[in-house]
Amino acid sequence: MKSFLVDQDGYYGEFGGAYIPEILHKCVEELTNKYLEVIESEEFKKEFEQLLRDYVGRPSPLYLAKRLSEKYGCKLYLKREDLNHTGAHKINNTIGQILLARRMGKKRIIAETGAGQHGVATATVCALMDMECIVYMGKTDVERQHINGEKMKMLGATVIPVTSGNMTLKDATNEAIRDWCCHPADTYYIIGSTVGPHPYPDMVARLQSVISEEIKKQLQEKEGRDYPDYLIACVGGGSNAAGTIYHYINDERVGIILAEAGGKGIETGMTAATIQLGKMGIIHGARTYVIQNEDGQIEEPYSISAGLDYPGIGPIHANLAAQRRANVLAINDDEAIEAAYELTKLEGIIPALESAHALGALRKLKFKPEDIVVLTVSGRGDKDIETYLSFNEQQ
């Protein structure tokens, strides 16, 4: 049977690998040789699970959204990652990677962030574990996610605004990689999504897989079976999606639906719909689909959501799309915002703009009344209130 998980060479089918400058070979090799041994050790698992339980507040609830279920004609459960400490799924990964960094003797943590959720989660865990923390954030994102920038500073992190390119996530990642090249010995680079060179996509997916591990147990309790008919998640780099599908990825009974950012529409050029528009390329050390021009130059992506405007996609998801294991839908800005308002009015939950893209997929799908659908609400909407309000005023 075909497996959709990573192979021993760090590939998902033809996607993945580690295409890195020579100066980083040693760092990446050290990580590749160490990560499985550490994260599979009993001592690590015990500390990781204890922090997820007592500090993050896991397991996160699996909530039957009755009014939304009625509207879409199925049994719709929401996996509430928005209820974690720091308000999103990102902290599952930062706790795991910083525990790993500590075991590797690293003293300085660097991170990139788009919406600021990964930055806040990294700064939070660095404060908890007394580590130096430097976060690179595009100047555009510093402005549109001002509160998260201030939170990171309050937590003791140094926030460096990046002024190259579009001044968003891709540019912040470039700067973080540059920093890592300059300080390979004492620095650990913590990537917030299933992107970058192997072993990052696999490591992040494994650390986030706590999401689907809990879904299995929670469905067994609520429905008497441990699998849904469909899983729905938004995808930028793809870490919440990877965590949502991890334990179901090879289970053909479970349909996988991924929602990427359509922006102002895939035909407008103002979009981040990598699966719809991307061609094979290399970005940040991985071979995957990339939005690029005829000359292979990476195009600037656009999405109203700071967490989804990435011109690549995690290799795990590129492979799922190429093998037709996942159905990938592009959800435009207005569709996402409409879906966010709908969830807020029907269930009293204000989702992050990223999660709103997953919710926006619901109206493009047809369900049977007995279908069990699990949709991951990857984060809460506090950081996006201004965007929601200003979009509404423009209408």
Region spans (language model):
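A short, small-residue-rich loop immediately preceding and capping a beta-strand
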Residues: 85, 101-138, 226-240, 256-259, ...
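Short glycine/serine/threonine-rich phosphate/pyrophosphate-binding segments
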Residues: 87, 91-97, 111-129, 143-145, ...
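Active-site-proximal loop->helix
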Residues: 110, 118-176, 267-278, 384-393
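Active-site/ligand-binding loops adjacent to catalytic centers
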Residues: 173-177, 181-199, 250-253, 258-349, ...
